[in-house]
Amino acid sequence: MAQSPQLKQSSPTSPDPQDFRLDATPAMRADNVVSGEHWRIGLITDSLVRFEWSDSGVFENRPTQTVLNRDFGSPVERRVTERDGRVIIDTAALTIVYDQQPFSKEGLSVVVKGVADTQFNTWHYGDAQRGNLKGTARTLDEADGAIELDNGVISRDGWAVIDDSAANIIIETDTVNGKANPFGTWVSPRATAETDLYFFGYGHRYIEAVRDFYRLTGPTPLLPRFAMGNWWSRYYRYTQDGYLALMDRFKREGIPFTTSVIDMDWHRVDDVDPKYGSGWTGYSWNRELFPDPPAFLADLHRRGLRTTLNVHPRDGVRAFEDAYPEVAKRVGIDPATEENVEFDLTNPDFVDAYFDMHHRMEAEGVDFWWLDWQQGGVTRQKGLDPLWMLNHMHYLDSGRGGNWPLTFSRYAGPGPPLPGRLLRRHDRDLGIARLPAAVHRHRFQHRVWLVEPRHRRPHVRLPQRRAGGPLVPARRVQPDQPTAFVQLAVLRQGAVELQP
């Protein structure tokens, strides 16, 4: 049986730019492009088309936050004709009609061939995607039943559209905003505005549509085996000894776990001076609860458990933090002033110091991070979502030096790594397990409050609420009363062990 790949322990090091390079083929094949002065139509496949309009006549050939590969390696057979000022492009799957003017509902349309069971297989620019079979949502906080989902790439009407116009581009650069960039690559706004759409006209060939979407946005990372197992997560003020005793009890009762999720009480929370704000963000161990963090993490490893710590990065690094003096100096702040080091992912000096702070804790035994970003989608850079940037940078950083990359976070749009969800209500009412693949979500993990044997989620994390929290009381597992909780944990672990 294949062994789970190892997550190597890291040490504080300067980033190797090679770890942040992207393996991408972003330029379209020249022989698959039909274009004019201000427009460009790229036939990536006979069913996947890129539509661009640029007032400046400058088009983007570099990778974006979403799209890495626009050259699939083969010419696309098509017939191109011009009639009455309109360009007509016929492929095996599509008929495109375009008036060579700024995109409009009247001037740009696509007919998807071979879709007999709908009257809506023709797309006009700007049409609402009423038949879209959806992807997922950024968060399930407070969800109770049906919620609005983002669009995916498959549809009952045979077509779907992804608008990449606002996405930043990924560039190789030695400097960012006049500062040295130790990462080699960076995310930058587009130099010129353009409309940049991807049209998926696969009819009901859903698997093919999703497969080509994965090719467009980059390959699916392979998860280490342990990540497929059961994770223990409870929002509760554990002590070091109490947590280890609980892990030992689970083992005695035959309840298998592979991963320990330590929620936010691993760091200082309640004793933070109000002058610094709340204790929601923190990077300093709570020594009253965890007096010897390296020993605690080593004890978890000896029990065969990987460890992830919950972090809410929004408030940056404040003067009460252990790492504050060094981080402040790195960004040009005199530590004596106790000025807050702002969380700013557009500043490479901060990002470099931020990751060094994490590397030191990884050297103590932290395996990976639970990035629990909840504060919206705005940074100092136009179009750059902080959650996306966190996911992107943490995932690449976790793979430095040949390590097996793994990051646990929320969904920030099509393509990022393993997302999590915080469920406040019964998971059975949400019905989302089958949806995320349409936005490159091949592994999804849910907190489950009500566990039933029929629930076979792609990922299941079995949490309990912090003492005093609302909605759901802690659920005790009695050794003489097997519950669905125990049954599901054992069932899932058996399934993991059977994987090749």
Predicted regions and their residues:
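Aromatic- and carboxylate-enriched substrate-binding clefts and catalytic-loop regions
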Residues: 256-500
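A low-complexity, Ser/Thr/Gly/Pro-enriched, surface-exposed linker/loop concept
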Residues: 12, 44-84
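Catalytic and substrate-binding clefts that recognize carbohydrates or anionic sugar/phosphate headgroups
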Residues: 81-224, 234-235, 240-241, 247-252
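N-terminal-proximal low-complexity accessory segments that begin disordered
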Residues: 20-57
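A residue-level signal for conserved active-site and pocket-lining positions in enzyme catalytic cores
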Residues: 41, 152, 250, 300, ...
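A conserved hydrophobic secondary-structure block that centers on an alpha-helix together
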Residues: 142-143, 220-223, 227, 233-274, ...
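Short, exposed beta-strand/loop patches in secreted or surface proteins that constitute
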Residues: 32-34, 40-42, 75-82, 87, ...
